[in-house]
C-alpha cells in the first residue's frame, strides 16, 4: 500500500467516435477495498523495489553499465563493466562484477538489453507528462482513469489520463516503428 498513490475503481474508455464505456469495479465486484487498479509513480516503485532487494540481501551499486560480457554461448557467467558513482564524484570509477543472472529493469530503451545484444523485440514507446490540476478538477479524477483509443492519439496504442499523487499523468504511446507519427502529436 505504501507505493500506491490512488486506488482507481472506475475506468472510462473513449472511442474515436466519442462513444464512452464506463467500467466500475464496484458494479463488478461490489463495494470492497480489495478490488482496484493501483496507480503509482515510477520513481516511488523503483525506490520500493531497490529497498526491498536490499532488505533481501542484494548489494546496491550506484552505477552505469557500459558493457556486458555474456560468457560462453551467451549463457553466463556474465561480466558487467560499469562506472561506479557510489563515491558521489561526477566521474565514475571503472569496475567489473561477475554475476550469474541479470535483470534489466531500465526501461524500453534498455542499456542492459543493448549491452548484452538481447536482439530485436517489439518495443512500445510512451510519452507522458505530469499535470497539476486545480482541486476541483483533481477531485473529478479521485478514482477515475481515462483511456482514449483512435488514430488521433496513436496509430496502434492509446492515450490516457491516470490520477497520481497530486497530479494526473497524461500520455500516449505507440510501437517503436511508429514513433515518428506519434512525435507529431507532441507540443
Predicted ranges, named:
Residues 51-187:
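Predominantly flavin-linked oxidoreductase catalytic cores and closely associated redox partners
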Residues 2-48:
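A conserved beta-strand/loop capping segment in the N-terminal third of enzymes
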Amino acid at each position: 500500500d505504501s507505493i500506491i498513490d490512488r486506488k482507481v475503481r472506475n475506468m472510462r474508455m473513449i472511442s474515436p467516435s466519442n462513444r464512452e464505456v464506463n467500467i466500475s469495479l464496484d458494479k463488478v465486484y461490489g463495494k470492497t477495498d480489495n478490488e482496484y487498479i493501483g496507480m503509482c509513480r515510477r520513481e516511488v516503485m523503483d525506490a520500493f523495489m531497490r529497498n526491498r532487494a536490499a532488505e533481501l540481501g542484494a548489494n546496491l551499486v550506484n552505477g552505469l553499465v557500459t558493457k556486458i560480457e555474456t560468457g560462453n554461448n551467451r549463457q553466463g557467467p556474465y561480466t558487467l563493466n560499469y562506472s561506479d558513482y557510489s563515491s558521489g564524484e561526477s566521474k565514475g570509477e571503472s569496475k567489473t562484477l561477475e554475476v550469474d543472472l541479470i535483470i534489466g529493469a531500465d526501461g524500453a530503451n534498455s542499456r542492459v538489453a543493448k549491452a548484452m545484444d538481447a536482439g530485436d523485440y517489439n518495443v512500445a514507446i510512451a510519452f507522458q507528462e505530469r499535470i497539476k490540476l486545480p482541486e476541483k478538477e483533481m477531485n473529478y479524477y479521485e478514482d477515475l482513469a481515462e483511456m482514449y483509443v483512435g488514430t488521433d492519439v496513436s496509430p496502434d496504442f492509446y492515450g490516457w489520463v491516470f490520477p497520481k499523487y497530486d497530479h494526473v499523468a497524461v500520455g500516449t504511446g505507440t510501437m517503436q516503428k511508429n514513433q515518428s507519427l506519434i512525435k507529431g502529436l507532441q507540443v
